[in-house]
């Protein structure tokens, strides 16, 4: 039966046998708790089952493991949007700090004629724009119920990496001010890394994209 036999359940807090082992201490997103949970002889009522108890091997049944995987087509654009937003906030604050330091940034002039700091900033802006457009496309397809697995993975891969690169780049451009807790740049840099990891790492996204483009199954391309 394999994956078709995997089912999802709701296990309420306080159910006997369910124990929170520990709260993780993380690099970022510290306001969002992450915990390890252990189940020891935890009895879950049948009515807590999500979906049908039958094992349905038909493609697109949307239950169990397949249903869980299908949710990524909607959640990956959301994570991409979080990364895009985090990067945008960093860029806006960095531009303000650079201008206060006397760095002129001209969006209408070639980068080779501008200062090194301005040229680097404009490169980060360019990377952000690509992530933003991919995120819009994948989200629009999800909203309109169009198949978007490839686009969702592309947006997640691009925006996740750009979010991390841009926020770190902004910390670097702002020097000691960016690295200190004086402003939010260091926090955004820490928070953004998880957006490059959860909902599927870079390696997972690239594998999914390759399978879709080449028309290969998960058993044919691992």
Question: How would you label these PLM feature ranges?
Answer:
Residues 1-84, 88-92, 205, 215-222:
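FAD-binding core of flavoproteins
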Residues 62, 71-222:
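Alpha-helical interface subdomain recognition
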